[in-house]
Swiss-Prot record:
Enzyme class of the recorded protein, top EC level: translocase
Superkingdom of source: Eukaryota
Disulfide partners: none
Name of the gene this protein is made from: MT-ND2
Protein name in UniProt: NADH-ubiquinone oxidoreductase chain 2
GO CC list: mitochondrial inner membrane
Species of provenance: Cheiromeles parvidens (Lesser naked bat)
Protein's job: Core subunit of the mitochondrial membrane respiratory chain NADH dehydrogenase (Complex I) which catalyzes electron transfer from NADH through the respiratory chain, using ubiquinone as an electron acceptor. Essential for the catalytic activity and assembly of complex I.
Length: 347
C-alpha cells in the first residue's frame, strides 16, 4: 500500500477513536465510530484476495448493524431526556440497546461470531489493530455509561464470552483464530468487572493490549500463522519461538506471568462484592484458555524430533535484529506480576 495512503488511513483510524474518547455529544460519538469503521476497512483488504474481501464485508455489516443500534439508543434517550450531551441514560430500553450495540462492536457473546472469521482472513498487522486499537472506543463508551448498564445483562454476556473464548479455541490450529478467541475471553473478563470497578477494566485492557501486541509482533517476525508453522520455527529461531510460547502462556493467565495479574485482581474484586459463584465459574472456564495454550506449547517445544539445522548462521540472525524494539514489550507482558502490591491503589 502507498505510504501516503497508509498514513492517511492510520490517521483517520486514530482520529475516529480520539473523537469517541473525548466527546460528550452522542452525535459526535457516532461520527467517531463511523470514521473508525470506514477507515479500517482498507486495512483489512490490504492483501487483494477473496478471504480479505470476505473478512472486510463481514466486519462492515456487523459494525454497521451495531452503529444502527447505537443511533437507535441515542434517539430513544433523546426522546426522554431532550438533550444530545451527557453520558446519563434516562431510559432502560436505551441502556439495553446501547449495551447490545457496544458489545457487538467489541465482539462479546452472543455477537462474537464475526471476530474469528474476520481475524482469520486478514494479515497479521491488520489483526493486531483489529484486536487491540479497535477495542478502545467501545470500551470507553461502556466505561462512561457504566452506571446505567443493566448489571445482569452485562454479567451474563461476560460469562458467555469467557466460556465461548475457551471452548472456541480448543480445536483451533490457526493462530489468528486462537488470538481472536483469546480476545473474546479477555473482553469477557474486562466487562465482568466494569460496573464494580471500572478502573480495573482499564488495567486489564492495558495488560491485554501489551500481551496481544507482543504476540502479534513475534508472529510477524517468524511469519507463523498456524501451530505447525510455529513448530517448524524452533530450529530456525529458538529464542523467538521460546518467547512466543511464554507470551502465549501469559495470555492464558498462568502464574507467575503478567497475564495472571488482571485475573487475580478481578476475582478478588468480585469476591469483595459478595459475588462467589461468578468468579468461581470464571476461574474454572479460564482453564480452557490455558489448556489450549499449553497444548500449543507442548506440541511446539516438547515434542521435537532430532534434526540437523542446515540453515546459514547469517540467516538465523537476520530476524533477531527487531528484538531491540520487542524487549520492553516482552518484559511488560511476562514479568510484571511483582508489581501486584502497587495495584492496591485501584481499590
Amino acid at each position: 500500500m502507498n505510504p501516503l495512503i497508509m498514513s492517511i488511513i492510520m490517521s483517520t483510524i486514530i482520529l475516529g477513536t480520539l473523537i469517541v474518547m473525548t466527546s460528550s455529544h452522542w452525535l459526535m460519538i457516532w461520527i467517531g465510530f463511523e470514521m473508525n469503521m470506514l477507515a479500517i476497512i482498507p486495512m483489512l483488504m490490504k492483501h487483494h484476495n477473496p478471504r480479505s474481501t470476505e473478512a472486510a464485508t463481514k466486519y462492515f455489516f456487523t459494525q454497521a448493524t451495531a452503529s444502527m443500534l447505537l443511533m437507535l439508543a441515542v434517539i430513544i434517550n433523546l426522546m426522554y431526556s431532550g438533550q444530545w450531551t451527557g453520558m446519563k441514560l434516562f431510559n432502560p430500553t436505551a441502556s439495553i440497546i446501547m449495551t447490545l450495540a457496544l458489545t457487538m462492536k467489541l465482539g462479546l457473546a452472543p455477537f462474537h461470531f464475526w471476530v474469528p472469521e474476520v481475524a482469520q482472513g486478514i494479515p497479521l498487522s491488520s489483526g493486531l489493530i483489529l484486536l487491540t486499537w479497535q477495542k478502545l472506543a467501545p470500551l470507553t463508551v461502556l466505561y462512561m455509561i457504566s452506571p446505567a448498564i443493566n448489571l445482569y445483562l452485562l454479567l451474563t454476556m461476560s460469562m458467555a464470552s469467557i466460556a465461548i473464548g475457551g471452548w472456541g479455541g480448543l480445536n483451533q490450529t490457526q493462530l489468528r483464530k486462537i488470538m481472536a478467541y483469546s480476545s473474546i475471553a479477555h473482553m469477557g473478563w474486562m466487562t465482568a468487572i466494569l460496573i464494580y470497578n471500572p478502573t480495573m477494566t482499564l488495567l486489564n485492557l492495558v495488560i491485554y493490549i501489551l500481551m496481544t501486541t507482543t504476540m502479534f509482533m513475534l508472529l510477524m517476525i517468524n511469519s507463523s500463522t498456524t501451530t505447525l508453522s510455529l513448530s517448524h520455527m524452533w530450529n530456525k529461531m529458538p529464542l523467538i519461538t521460546t518467547i512466543t510460547l511464554v507470551t502465549l502462556l501469559s495470555l492464558g493467565g498462568l502464574p507467575p506471568l503478567t497475564g495472571f495479574l488482571p485475573k487475580w485482581m478481578i476475582i478478588q474484586e468480585l469476591t469483595k462484592n459478595d459475588s462467589i459463584i461468578l468468579p468461581t465459574l470464571m476461574a474454572i472456564t479460564a482453564l480452557l484458555n490455558l489448556f489450549f495454550y499449553m497444548r500449543i506449547t507442548y506440541a511446539t517445544s516438547l515434542t521435537m524430533f532430532p534434526t540437523t539445522n542446515n540453515m546459514k548462521i547469517k540467516w538465523q540472525f537476520e530476524n533477531t535484529k527487531h528484538l531491540n524494539l520487542l524487549t520492553p514489550m516482552i518484559v511488560l507482558s511476562t514479568l510484571t506480576l511483582p508489581l501486584a502490591p502497587m495495584m492496591t491503589i485501584l481499590n
